[in-house]
């Protein structure tokens, strides 16, 4: 069906509902002896033949749905004969990441038609494990504010978030089982929350940023999108990182959270109550003030470093850089002393949170202020994610079960180096939350 032949309301509902129906449809051996995989966990368990069929279905979905969602800059499947755990499994990658022979346009019309001449380190890593690069996903311009044309598969009249807009939308729409993004403030965790998928960013510096367009050298971190926490855990394991087994410990959660919208406040409160009733030990912690100041420090660092990195580009293109031009002008007004003060505050908070993580090894917060904003003019507010990006801690956003309502994410973070703990806990909490609306 061509989406231009159905009503906007019907089209908006069909895009996501059709994928969910396919993913959750009960089957019998008489009906379908070998179901075509949907989630990454299913892909990993599938035969090579079933992976081929699933890849073709991904391409068919892109052909059908892309005119409405605009998740991609370019779709051009790259051959990969390497045998690995991800062999034959497709993925998308944010268009600030260099890819040899494919468009690398940074989300800006200035670089329209630019073709990458080298592969970023993360692309080489994926190739080593056998994954198939399907193409480049949309990003806000230079991974900053100017929105991409991407629409949220859960509601086409809303943003998918940013700056990793296309990667989140592509996974949410079932176009790929996983995708790569990048976060400087909240560019992975917030889109994951808005699109109802799982987002994850590891500890700052753990994954090489070689070949990724910088915005802030002290903050930029690669991240991933999958359908479920179990998929994310499987992806991390497939890349050679041990996840280990589940463990019991106290969780920390600030209650209430200032500034969140009523829908998020209610969902967050209900999620904590549901988890406590299911046996989780959750201790209230008083960190809201520190989180707000950390978000401000994150912004200061990003503006200062981003303005200096992009100064030469600004001198050449000026206001053609759109919102990035404003970043350069604002950032150049920040003194070195003020920048250093922000870095010192972040360092002091790392020490304080290291002690907090000894008491509550995983901290829970909302993954966004609320659901995805209406329209495409704004990709949403990153203040719930920016503190953890500043601290460089691993963090994940998992979907809270909210039924047919707009998606909302629950955010988890742990001490630096605690990727396995975050992922194990994410899987455990998702299982405890279940699928019934909270």
Report the location of each language-model feature.
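Short glycine/serine-rich loop segments
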Residues: 118-236, 394-402, 406-411
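Glycine-rich, small-residue loops and helix-cap segments
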Residues: 88, 128, 132, 226, ...
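Gly/Ser-rich, acidic/histidine-flanked active-site/gating loops
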Residues: 33-37, 42-44, 97-100, 221, ...
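Conserved hydrophobic/aromatic pocket- or pore-lining residues that grip, position, or stack substrates
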Residues: 58, 94, 126, 275, ...
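Acyltransferase
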Residues: 53-55, 264-285, 311-316, 339-360
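Short, well-ordered alpha-helical
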Residues: 18-23, 29-115, 142-144, 261, ...
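Short helix-loop capping/hinge segments that flank enzyme active sites or metal/cofactor-binding pockets
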Residues: 86-106, 300-354, 399-409
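N-terminal secretory signal peptides
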Residues: 1-9, 13
């Amino acid at each position: 069906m061509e989406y231009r032949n159905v009503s906007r309301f019907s089209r908006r509902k069909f895009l996501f509902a059709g994928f969910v129906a396919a993913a959750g449809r009960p089957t019998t051996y008489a009906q379908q002896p070998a179901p075509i995989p949907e989630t990454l966990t299913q892909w990993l368990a599938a035969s090579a033949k079933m992976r081929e069929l699933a890849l073709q279905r991904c391409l068919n979905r892109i052909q059908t749905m892309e005119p409405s969602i605009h998740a991609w800059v370019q779709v051009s499947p790259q051959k990969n004969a390497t045998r690995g755990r991800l062999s034959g499994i497709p993925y998308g990658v944010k268009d600030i990441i260099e890819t040899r022979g494919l468009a690398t346009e940074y989300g800006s019309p200035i670089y329209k038609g630019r073709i990458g001449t080298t592969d970023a380190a993360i692309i080489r890593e994926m190739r080593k494990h056998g994954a198939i690069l399907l193409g480049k996903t949309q990003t806000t311009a230079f991974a900053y504010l100017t929105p991409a044309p991407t629409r949220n598969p859960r509601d086409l009249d809303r943003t998918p978030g940013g700056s990793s807009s296309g990667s989140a939308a592509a996974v949410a729409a079932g176009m790929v089982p996983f995708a790569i993004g990048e976060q400087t403030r909240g560019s992975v965790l917030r889109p994951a929350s808005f699109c109802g998928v799982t987002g994850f960013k590891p500890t700052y510096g753990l994954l090489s940023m070689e070949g990724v367009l910088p915005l802030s050298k002290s903050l930029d971190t690669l991240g991933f999108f999958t359908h479920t926490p179990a998929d994310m855990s499987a992806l991390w394991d497939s890349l050679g990182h041990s996840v280990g087994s589940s463990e019991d410990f106290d969780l920390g959660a600030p209650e209430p959270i200032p500034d969140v919208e009523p829908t998020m406040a209610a969902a967050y409160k209900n999620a904590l109550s549901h988890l406590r009733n299911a046996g989780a030990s959750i201790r209230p912690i008083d960190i809201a003030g520190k989180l707000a100041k950390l978000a401000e420090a994150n912004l200061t660092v990003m503006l200062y470093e981003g303005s200096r990195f992009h100064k030469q580009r600004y001198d050449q293109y000026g206001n053609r850089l759109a919102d990035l031009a404003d970043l350069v002008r604002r950032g150049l007004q920040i003194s070195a002393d003020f920048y250093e003060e922000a870095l010192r505050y972040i360092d002091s908070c790392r020490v304080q949170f290291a002690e907090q993580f000894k008491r509550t090894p995983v901290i829970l917060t909302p993954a966004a202020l609320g659901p995805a904003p209406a329209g495409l003019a704004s990709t949403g507010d990153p203040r719930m994610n920016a503190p953890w990006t500043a601290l460089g801690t691993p963090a994940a956003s998992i979907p809270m079960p909210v039924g047919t309502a707009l998606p909302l994410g629950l955010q988890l973070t742990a001490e630096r180096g605690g990727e396995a703990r975050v992922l194990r806990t994410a899987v455990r909490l998702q299982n405890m939350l279940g699928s019934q609306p909270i």
